[in-house]
Amino acid sequence: MSKLFQDSNKRMSRIVDYDEIKFDPLSIIGSGGFGKVYQGVLNGKEIGIKKITISDNDPNRDILLKFLEREIYTLKMLSHPNVIKFYGIAEKERSLFLLTELVSGGDLHWYIKNKSIDITWKLKVKIARDIAASMAYLHENGVIHRDLKSTNLLVAENWVIKVCDMGLARKMDKSEKSKMTICGTDDWMAPEVLIGEEYDASCDVFSFGMVLIELITRENLTPRIRNEDLGVDQKFFLSKVPADCPKELLRLVSECCKVAPSGRPSASNILGLLEYILESELIVNSGGDYEPPLRSFKPPELHLPLNEKNNNNKNNNNNNNNNNNNNNNNNNNNNNNNNNNNNNNNNNNNNNLGNSGNIYDDFSFPRPYQPDDSAVDNINNNGNDDSHFSFPRPYQPGQSNINGGVNNNNSNDESHFSFPRPYQPGQSNINGCVNNNNNNSNNNNDSHFSFPRPHQTSVVILNDRGEEEPLVVSQKDQLEHDLEGGDDNEEDEMKQLKSQLNYSKFSFPRPYQSSKIISFNETELLSFPRPWNPESEENNNNKNNNNNEKSLLEDPKYSFPRPYNPDSDSNLSFKSTAKVITNPTPLTTTTTTTTATATTTSSSSTNSKVTTNSTSLPTTTTTTTTTTATTSSSSLSSIGKPPQSTYKVPTTINPSTSQRVITIPSRIVTSTATAQPKSRSNSNPPKPTVVISNSNNNFNDIVKPSSTIVNQNKTTTQPTTLINAPQKVTTPVNKQIQPLHKSNESVTVAATTATTPTTATSTTIKSSPTTPTSTNQNIEQIKITTPKDEDENKSETNDGGGDTVSHRRSRSLDIKNSTKAIIKKFEELTRFSSQQSNLVHQPSSSSSSTKQPPTSQFLQNPRMEAKLSFAQETLVFEKSPSTSPKSLDIPTSSSLTSNSNSSIPAPSSPTKKTFWNKPKK
């Protein structure tokens, strides 16, 4: 019994003597879970030998022995074409050797990942059938493999699959589940094994489904193939499936990889399905019964032929003799021969050992470089004389002779498969020994697999004849050409630089550096665009003008976008459209003189009709008066409305001419010509406009506050002077009744308000004192006020004078009809007042007084009061007892308290008195 299993109760049969086994320790064909696999011979039959070594100090010794014992026990009881055959075990020096049949094709995983091997669908079904047959055989014998995967499936001749590596196999009852050790490989393990639940033989079915996924997709399994339930992600799996995959295989994968163990088919059912598919030829295979060749594992030849060894020894001896002769020129020939013989003997032994290890055949196992340190005095390092399949290794620099020996460094004799390395400069001999270093001679000999370097483009130049055929020269020749083309003054410097340029093909590549200075104009279009520079532009323009060449930067298409330069750039032309809104500009003060003469006449007929006509105003220009025109900027708030303007024309009054003051409202418009004057110059001031509005049947049958009434007295012969000035009046709300004074000579009509005064404009007309009185009744004073506009949305405040002006459209612009309506009202007033005076009061005897009494006196005399309301307008009129000519005021608002030009002061404490009393019967 084996010493390893001497404590085991199981009988270890089939024990083979180690001396019966013949194998080379270098003939490794693979590795398993517990050791390496070698190719050997047992009784003239090729076998596979699995070497397992377990040291006494290994902490997992007991576990490893347990699984090893289980594998041996399982293999010796199994015999199936799809299960690897067991021959016995052997032991030597605490190592155990498992003897099995030799499967030279390798594992299935190597064929799956190597996509250059064409595996048809029919062959894949055959592979799946063999795996299912082995699995059904194991399950029938109560064995669970628990580590079924593609690396544990070997490919024998004729593509027969054999299951191996039974180290984790476990014999158990077929009908019961048990909680066993979590073992296996994660990518192939069933969900119940991963989470530590009880499992049975169905775990091998899940692993079989994962092997089918490898066969179909021919890709390595990754955790991405599993979903959150530890099953198979069908969506991801189907994305990797080829288009020509048989549906039967996809259905089989879906059934085998179910999460629930009870839903998976048994191994025997899987085997029957696959055999049915192969027999019925359900899979159409274009390749027929093609089977790709298998992977071969021929053991390597361990030694070189004798003639090749002798040639190597002779070369080494000659090299050593030459080196020794150079080192010992002062010694005798006998000493040289003795030294040569001794050195040759040592070198022969060392070289033979080195050559046997360094020069491999085509199937040697790759291994790293191992320097030979046995010969210290004389190192013949032939490590770089590699075979075609030697392991690639880094560059080993020439080792210096520490003890004064001879150093033959042939490190630069590179093989075609040597490790790529950068340029290594020659090493110096540390102790002054002779160093036959061949680096300088071999530096320029590039191997095909030398250190990679970037691509060096060739330079294209023109030949000396100026032809367009380019000459392709190397980088070195171009650089030398540039260096030789320098100036005479720089010849010494260029030669010195040229002497320093010792290029080697082993040197690290450097970018091309040309000594030629390329002008900017030659590469202008390819250079980076730059901003405009005025100084360089001028210099370039001057230079180009001299050379009759056009500057490249002159064209803005190739220059960098730059700011506009008014000196050199052309004028910018662009079209723009704008909606022009006329904004009145504040007018400056100008001077003008206007002398106006107005003739005012009044006449009365027998039925006491008063005739009022418009006043003709012939004007003349002098040099002594000024006109001030102001426009409020706030009037621009409403477009289309004319600005307020006030024109004030003071004049010099002749002694024989009385002064008449007329205030013209600024917002009175009767035509478009007067809405916005064309000119505000001295020669064309806006003319006052007379607007009288009247209606027939509603409450608007009144004179608007913007109206100007001019009465013409027929008896007046002397002209009057017009003075235009802004006045402040109050906006009437409630009208007060003023006393009425009636005489045979004059009639004065006045209206005032009792509310808070506001700004407004007024017009006052004063007649000449020299005007002779008429026997008819003369209208001395007329004041007409209107109530505030009831439509608040249509009213607007005049910013210049503060007037509250109504902008209602004039109902009639016919002056004749409007004048007739006013005259009719005055006739009714006059007739009514005359009747009341005759009935109640006596005529006043003081009618010849020349001075008009104040308004307060009128209020105290009830005998002189009268009132009449029409069209929501209250008119208070009075008859003056004096017959002297009085002034006529026509205000546009109700109050004259703030008007300095008013002839009648406002009453301080007005008292309401009514003259009307019913006549007593």
Swiss-Prot record:
ATP binds at residues 29-37, 50. Residues 643-653 have a biased composition (Polar residues). Residues 289-453, 465-492, 530-571, 583-653, 671-698, 737-813, 833-858, 877-921 are annotated as: Disordered. GO terms for biological process: signal transduction. It catalyses: L-seryl-[protein] + ATP = O-phospho-L-seryl-[protein] + ADP + H(+); L-threonyl-[protein] + ATP = O-phospho-L-threonyl-[protein] + ADP + H(+). It is an enzyme of class 2 (transferase). Residues 310-352, 400-412, 429-445, 539-550, 583-638, 748-775, 842-857, 892-910 have a biased composition (Low complexity). Gene3D superfamilies: Phosphorylase Kinase, domain 1 (3.30.200.20), Transferase(Phosphotransferase) domain 1 (1.10.510.10). The active site is at 147 (proton acceptor). InterPro entries: Actin_reg-Ser/Thr_kinase, Kinase-like_dom_sf, Prot_kinase_dom, Ser-Thr/Tyr_kinase_cat_dom, Ser/Thr_kinase_AS. It comes from the Eukaryota. This is Probable serine/threonine-protein kinase DDB_G0275165. It comes from Dictyostelium discoideum (Social amoeba). The lineage of its organism: Eukaryota, Amoebozoa, Evosea, Eumycetozoa, Dictyostelia.
